[in-house]
């Protein structure tokens, strides 16, 4: 009779959008007065950002510029895991930031408990780095989406394949 509906909960960062945001941020840095003559750079190496600047203050400003450009390009900034600031060559400082892709086991468990605590008749299962939610009623699935969106998760989640 009624076909089961489902959707997937994923956590992805679009790397082309990150690259575009980096290019825009570098363009702004090259024209800003407070960055004149400084050795500031942002690069993307696979799924890791590398920020380099003269000192920690300029590094924090560099990070602020990058975050503002990422927000404008709709890239989730929750999925950026910043490392510690370290000394680099030439008297500069470097900070690495890992782009978190996918939902790890701990966050998948948190999402599952949110779904179970909702009390709705839906099933959830962890599949690699995503969580699939199935149920007969589409309204229940939409309530699950709003419950997961409202939860305070350490990563940004997207909802795809709503069938």
Curated annotation (Swiss-Prot):
InterPro entries: DUF520 (IPR007551), UPF0234-like_C (IPR035571), UPF0234_N (IPR035570), YajQ-like_sf (IPR036183). Gene3D superfamilies: 3.30.70.860, YajQ-like, domain 2 (3.30.70.990). The keyword Cytoplasm does not apply. Keywords: Nucleotide-binding. Coiled coil: none annotated. GO terms for cellular component: cytosol. One of its GO terms (molecular function) is nucleotide binding. The keyword Ribonucleoprotein does not apply. Nucleotide-binding protein. NCBIfam families: PRK05412.1 (NF003819). Belongs to the YajQ family. This is Nucleotide-binding protein BSU11020. It comes from Bacillus subtilis (strain 168).
């Amino acid at each position: 009779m009624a076909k089961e509906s489902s959707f997937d909960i994923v956590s992805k960062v679009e790397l082309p959008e990150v690259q575009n945001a980096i290019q825009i941020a570098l363009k702004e840095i090259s024209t800003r007065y407070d960055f004149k003559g400084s050795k500031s750079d942002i690069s993307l190496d696979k799924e890791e950002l590398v920020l380099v600047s003269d000192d920690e203050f300029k590094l924090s400003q560099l990070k602020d510029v990058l975050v503002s450009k990422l927000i404008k390009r709709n890239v989730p900034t929750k999925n950026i895991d910043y490392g510690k600031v370290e000394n680099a060559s030439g008297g500069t400082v470097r900070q690495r930031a890992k782009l978190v892709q996918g939902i790890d086991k701990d966050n998948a468990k948190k999402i599952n408990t949110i779904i179970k605590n909702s009390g709705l008749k839906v099933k959830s299962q962890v599949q690699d780095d995503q969580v699939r939610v199935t149920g007969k009623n589409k309204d229940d699935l939409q309530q699950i989406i709003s419950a997961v969106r409202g939860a305070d998760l350490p990563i940004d989640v997207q909802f795809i394949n709503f069938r």
